Regions:
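Extreme N-terminal tail/first-helix region
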Residues: 1-16
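Short acidic (Asp/Glu) patches
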Residues: 46-50, 63-68, 90-103
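Helix-adjacent hinge/juxtasegments
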Residues: 52-83
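Hydrophobic alpha-helical segments typical of transmembrane helices
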Residues: 2-5, 52, 92
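Short beta-strand segments
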Residues: 13-48, 56, 62-67
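Short secondary-structure boundary/capping segments
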Residues: 7-8, 34, 54, 102-103
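Charged, gly/pro-rich active-site loop segments
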Residues: 73-136
């Protein structure tokens, strides 16, 4: 399980930036997420025909960030992650709809990003303070 500081940070945010790469060309997209604490994974909704999902289906190794936007160096917080994207099922749909009940009306395709590595930067704990998570 991730350190409590990761979980606390992720609970205060709701958008991740997802990076994909196909044919040596990177791409990025923003996605609303629900975070599954027990399994260290993001649950997102996105149409399978979007560029980022098409690329992730070709190459499921993805990376991304969740950040706090601030101009104050002492308040910088952010998480970088690497993981693997897979299509979600009923459990992932339940988790996502718990956070975003209005999404039911759109009946989106649900995906899970299994976090294999993450780094959390939190300058409030001291400049350059970083925590790391690696899935075992």
């Amino acid at each position: 399980m991730m350190d409590e500081k990761f979980i606390h940070f992720l609970a205060r945010h709701h958008v991740l930036n997802l990076s994909t790469c196909n044919n040596n060309t990177p791409y990025a997209a923003s996605c609303f997420y629900a975070y599954d604490i027990e399994n260290a994974r993001f649950i997102v909704a996105s149409d399978a025909n979007t560029r980022h999902m098409q690329e992730a289906l070709e190459n499921p190794k993805v990376a991304g960030t969740v950040t706090l936007e601030t101009k104050s160096v002492g308040l910088i917080q952010g998480m970088q992650f690497m993981g693997e994207l897979k299509e979600g099922g009923d459990e992932e749909r339940r988790i996502y709809y718990q956070c975003y009940p209005f999404a039911r009306a759109m009946n989106p395709t649900i995906w899970q990003i299994i976090v294999n590595y993450a780094k959390l930067t939190d300058n409030r704990l001291g400049f350059g303070n970083k925590l790391e998570f690696t899935r075992e």
